[in-house]
Amino acid sequence: MTSFPHADLSLTEDQQKASDAFSDWLQQKDAGLPFVLSGYAGSGKTFLSMRLLRQVESSGLCWTVVAPTHKAVGVLRQALNLEGLQPTWYPSTIHRLLRLKLKRQGDRELCESTEQTAGALEHLGLVLIDEASMVDSSLLSIALQCAHPFKTRLVFVGDPAQLPPVGESESPVFAMNRAISACLREVVRHQGPVLQLASCLRDRRLPCELPPLLPPVHSDLGQVGVLNRSDWLSRAQEGLRQAAACDNPDAARILCYTNRRLEALVPHARRAIHGEMADQMAVLPGEVLITRTAVMAPASSDGGETGEEPDLVLGSNRELVVEDVSPERCDLAEFGVAGEAQLSLAGLGVPVIETLNAKVRSGELELNLRLQPPSGSQAREQLDALLKRLAQEARTAGKRGGRSLWRRYFLVRDAFASLGPAAVLTVHRSQGSSFGEVFVADDVFPRSLERLARDRQVFHQQLAYVAVSRARHGVYLVGDGHRNAASWSKALRGSV
């Protein structure tokens, strides 16, 4: 007889109440109301979700699980495999399940319904949506509309303390008035220093500001270190080096708040992983990259038909492995750019951008992508200047005359894939992922919380909580001074 992990573990009081509420909801004939399971890091959401899915399996319903990101889907697949559960439909992103079309708007992706969206849930009795805090209002509305005609039951699982979707003040899933809700408040996962730190930041037992320098706090369940900036960077580089040696990029990541800090940290991370070669080539074979924005069809020599959508080759936050790199001269004349005035203002004598073409792999998908020149390079400055000039011309032409000019602008912009090393991520991009060791940059923690407006205090609290709770084993912070050292030390040891 096959034994499953956690099979003999008893439920906490919170989990039992949630399980009972779910059972009652599952037996109701009216499936119109969704079920929302919320809980903080370590409260047992994944463990309980597997228990709930066993109930669904026993009921005979056709079911599947989805999440907003590919990384989060991978975590779900692993949990299902460990539990021996087999969904009716292969786990995927929610966008794929609902047959949504992704469109790029600036640096954001917007989802739109397609002809297949309305019938996407026709043969499914239940869908569990993990990492629900990342679901924005538009996506939530589409999911509810798709479920209604087929009486498909929707289960949302997420952490209300995480960052809300971009552009929204709160996660709309947890603000739904018409839903059956259950909340896991008791933290039951290993009470090591990592989870202790996350809990203390979430409930404000510790101030969300630059921490004091502390000796390492460690146990069999993990470690938290607060180091000066130099030691922190050295430790981060060593962690990345070891992760690369083990061919396990998820073993260590650096997380920061701003893109400016990310660009400053990337060279240090690349040197740690690739040595002297990092300074000689902007991209190297074997390097793990992440899509910083959606990659559109003009950036791929394979065309859009091999990607995720006809015009969109890859969504943002997709991790890729570089298999080969070659230089490329991108002739902008192919995109209608040849005017002397445009070229001279952009510092280009001829309509050519010197860049790289990378053969990349993501799972079974292989693509050849023209890369955006690296930040700070002459080619990048020329490209940015040209795009700025094209946008100015389009605005000056107005609505009637600017349509063709905007089309040319978007063709040039989308002709280059914006990729970056996955070793350094912003906290926002890290949501839905977990890593062995996490090195949190100092821009995540403000120096003085009291100087910030109330909404910014809440934001940094969520930011720090998400950063710390990405770690499975170890967290390393940048510290300064010794103020509040005693209270931090006690809190991390669970003495508060």
Give names to the regions the model predicted:
Residues M1-L9, S38:
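Conserved adenine-nucleotide phosphate-binding loops and their immediately adjacent elements
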Residues D8-L26:
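N-terminal pre-P-loop "Q-motif" helix
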Residues D14, D20, S38-S43, F47-R51, ...:
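Conserved helicase motor core of SF1/SF2 NTP-dependent helicases
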Residues A18, L289, L320, F435-V438:
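Generic structural signal for buried aliphatic residues
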Residues F22, D30, P160-Q382:
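Conserved helicase motor core of P-loop NTPases
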Residues P34-S38, T64, R253-L255:
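Short hydrophobic/aromatic beta-strand immediately N-terminal to the Walker A/P-loop
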Residues D107-L121:
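Conserved alpha-helical scaffold flanking the Walker A/P-loop in AAA+ ATPase domains
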Residues A333-V496:
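C-terminal accessory regions
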